[in-house]
Swiss-Prot record:
Any one GO cellular component localisation term in the record: outer membrane
Organism: Chlamydia muridarum (strain MoPn / Nigg)
Upper taxonomic lineage: Bacteria, Pseudomonadati, Chlamydiota, Chlamydiia, Chlamydiales
Keyword vocabulary terms for this entry: Membrane, Transmembrane, Transmembrane helix
Gene this chain is encoded by: srp
Protein name, per record: Sulfur-rich protein
Top-level taxon in the UniProt lineage: Bacteria
Length: 152
């Protein structure tokens, strides 16, 4: 089809997909997802969602006290997921670099939050975020990051 001038000197194109630049076409889905996941807004969003889930589980403890007495794990799941989101947000700030101090802070947040949420007391009754499990996670992260560095 031909283009017809709308205003003198300006033509209208029937196919707007031709206007897409070559740079936008060359980005693969993986590259676009990588840019989104590495953005600061996404990382802050993770922390905000985490805080929201923790607050939600605390509110549910007051709204549904009968459920909290019989099945406390149902109310602890959003809080645990929230704490994990907060820790992922903290660890991924500053271009993905994770210092030992940040990792130690996240381990303490995870262990303390689980300890408080399971029975309401700080008595080291953790079942999920134990020192052994967290050290395994740390070993896996180190292994995966060394593989990624060797491939690149």
């Amino acid at each position: 089809m031909s283009t017809t001038p709308i205003v003198s000197g300006v033509t209208s194109q029937n196919n707007s997909s031709e206007n897409v630049s070559n740079n936008a076409r060359s980005l693969t889905l993986k590259e676009r997802a990588s840019k989104i996941l590495s953005s600061t807004a996404f990382k802050v969003g993770l922390a905000v969602v985490g805080i929201f889930l923790v607050i939600l589980s605390i509110v549910l403890l007051f709204i549904l006290p009968a459920t909290a007495a019989s099945n406390p794990i149902y109310l602890a799941i959003p809080a645990i997921l929230g704490c994990v989101n907060i820790c992922i947000g903290i660890l991924s700030m500053n271009k993905g670099s994770c210092s030992e101090a940040k990792w130690k802070l996240c381990k303490n947040v995870l262990k303390t939050s689980e300890d408080i949420l399971d029975d309401g007391e700080l008595n080291n009754s953790n079942k999920i975020f134990t020192d052994d499990n967290l050290s395994r996670v740390e070993d896996i992260v180190i292994t995966l990051s060394s593989r990624r560095n060797s491939v690149a």
